[in-house]
Amino acid sequence: MTNDPYHDRESITELLKQYNNLRSGHGSIFFEEEAFEKIIDYFDDQEDISKALEAAETAIEYFPYSASLLIRKADLLLATRKYREALEILEKAELFDGTDINLYILKTDAYLAMDMQDKAVELLELAVGHFEGEEKIELLFELADVYDDYEEFDKVFDCLKVILEADPNNEEALYKICFWTDFTGRNEESIKLHLKIIDHNPYNELAWFNLAAAYQGLKLYEKAIDAYQYALVIDEKFDYAYRNIGDAYIRLRKYKEAIEALEKVLELSKPEEVIYEAIGHCYDRMKNFAQARFHYRKASHLNPDDSKLLYKVACTYFNEGLWTSAVKQLESALKIHRQQHEYNLLMGECKLKLNEYKDAVQYLSNAVRIRPKNLSGWEALIRCLFVAGYYTEARQQALAALSHTNNKTLFLYYLSAVLFQMNKTKEALLYLEKALSTSPKHLRKFIQLHPPILQNPQVVDIIAQYKRASK
């Protein structure tokens, strides 16, 4: 038998007419409880809460011992934020029928609205013990939501675990526990739980996926990939499995395999910038800068306001020695985020490569100002000033770098190199000795800064002395 919408409308119209007659005292027709419920539902659907509440009160006059009508009234009172009144009605309803699950759900809503979390938790924990099957599971979900709202996240995981132990194929719980496993870090428990679920039903692709995600959380990437593959055998269009396989392969530095998995994601789902960016990252690591750039650009087209993608394109040009092309990308990135340390640093390096020293100094000074404790900014600025022949300024910046970075040895070497160029040999040798005695490993950068320094016999002698002493 099919539903007839026209007949339904005609029926409710007639019912409303009879109800209005009853309210005005002109009708003598007997109303069944179900008829009142239809009228309440009608006004509720029309979002006329006051009339719905009026209908509920009228219904209760005729059926004062109906738990379902009292619960309906309490629900409407909650909608009007009359929480205490709603609780009083629910207490009364419980006397007539304490087995209606809506009693506990609505009481919980009232307690939470009144910021009485402890009462809500106590009620639900008690109620869970009185119900079985689907109703128990519904209450456990409700309890999990309460724990979530009040940031008791381990207890959220516990609720979902209990649900899955009772109903291993519950999709909502399977989806949620994947997130909460990652959030709480309870990967070992998740592995045990999902192995049991798979033992019960080996064709549950969500259980395989969650098992894989838990392995991934423990950095057991090969095991994770195997489990994702099982999920894909069951559902070959499971795009999130391919996505996570791609991530696992990236962690294993198997970039070619990662690209294959991520390209499958693009086949199965709507294009996303994060996928194109990840593919670009893989090509970047494989030093295929043209392909990396191609995918970073695709990501950028999907999110033009993400300056980081423009920066990554610039890095590919920089790695190929295409300084001018890198500068163009960085100019665009800096228009979006001018105060990014990395953008200013790379722009300074590009300008240095192009022998545009004044611009280079400006950008590198910005980088240092933005992150004064970062070594790379100071290192690049002093190196730039040295290459440009601005030795007085280089000396000042080397001293400033030592002050800001807790006397990092690298800047003792750089200060020594600068002093040699300023013909302050005695002072330069003192700083070189101090640097060598503190950390010989940065000697390479000292020599890289100015290779002809090895033609100075005093420098060669000091280095030789420290090499002999370290043997």
Give, region by region, the residue ranges found by the protein language model.
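Canonical positions in the second alpha-helix
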Residues: 59, 92-93, 127, 162-163, ...
